[in-house]
From Swiss-Prot:
Transmembrane residue ranges: 402-422, 437-457
Subcellular location field: Membrane
Native source species: Oryza sativa subsp. japonica (Rice)
Any one Gene Ontology molecular-function term assigned to this protein's record: magnesium ion transmembrane transporter activity
Annotated protein name in UniProt: Putative magnesium transporter MRS2-G
Bias kind Low complexity: ranges: 14-23, 31-45
Positions with biased composition (Basic and acidic residues): 187-201
Amino acid sequence: MGRRSGGRKLPFFASNASTSSSTKRTRSARRLPSLTRPRASSSPSPASPSPPPPSASHPAPPSPPLAVSPAGAGKVGKKKAGARLWMRLDRWGVSETLHLDKGSIIRRAGLPPRDLRILGPVFSDSSSILAREKAMVINLEFIRAIVTADEILLLDPLTIDVIPFVEQLTHHLPLKNLVCGNGQPGGDDHGEKHDDSHGDQVPRLNEATGAEHELPFEFQVLELALETVCSSFDVNVSGLERRATPVLEELTKNVSTRNLDRVRTLKSDLTRLLAHVQKVRDEIEHLLDDNEDMAHLYLTRKQLQNQQVEALISSAASNSIVPGGTSLSRLNNSFRRSVSIATSMHLDNDVEDLEMLLEAYFMQLDGIRNRILSVREYIDDTEDYVNIQLDNQRNELIQLQLTLTIASFGIAVNTFIAGAFAMNIQSKLYSIDDGSFFWPFVGGTSSGCFMICIVLLWYARWKKLLGP
């Protein structure tokens, strides 16, 4: 009875129970795919010994890795939701394109999430240069990048406007950062180690800046970004100047709807370009007004100061003879002394270098702004000239209207006299039958009306109501 025969059917409750149990096992297997159990044999053999339990001397073998299906591999290979195209370029010119989301950028550059919103499409028309602890956020027109002391992350590097900036980065940065002032590579990328002495463990700021006061990596990137933006502005202004000259000359010759529409388009483009130039100029002016903000932009100095702190901590930890409290106090004193020396030696020079850099491009942007304003003044002068022409034509129309009004008055007087004699009234003039009085009368009234018109025209000219 306990065994199941091939031809015998099970009761409905037994089949339902077996079906439900198999369904539960299937659901549990779907819920826990990693917990695989060995398949039990149909007839267990009592002679097969059970495996011994794992002990400390015989650890359990590791579980085999899970096999990934091709569909799962395809899902992993796809880019994440919200990921955007970035280009990474380090100080040695090594570049690569990456698809990174906001979380990866935040972890990589140490930025707050609100700074990434500045690089989004909502703030694409704004211009800003923000200094953070480990990075600098640059949003200048079409250039949106995150710059650290060692690399730059450029957003949307394949757009038409950004390609010249990418070419300048790849051509200039390796040449400027390849050799420092002492003839050695400027970075520690090859794993070189310093000596164990305290003087060699602490990085020196003059080694990173170079003997010829070469700009650090972040300032080189900022310089190239400002140069690219200013070059773009200069090209746009030159194009507007070439467009403005023939359009305005044509407008002075012929005031038509087509020419007025061309001038309106030119003026709107000029106003838009002036707004973009003004935003970048105001941002640079804001940085020049605050030395503290300019000092925060020096990311290389911050990195070297952090390396100083790590070197001092390692030197204090290696000194096992001195008690813990004394080592910490010495560590704090050494840190304060090194930071104060580094700040006093390099803060003024670094701010001065950045100030000179920003002032140069501020003057260039100011010159571009003056060129735009000169074109706008040219347009305004042309509009004033056109308005004068239109006023002159309007005055001529008014003079013509006045002349026609005076002539209409004389004709109306003559018509009134003729209409008065056309009425059925008693008059001695009707008794003259030979008609000798008709023509002198008509000629006299017409001459009188003409004289009235002449007198009115002379009076209008005397009052300067009519032109010469």
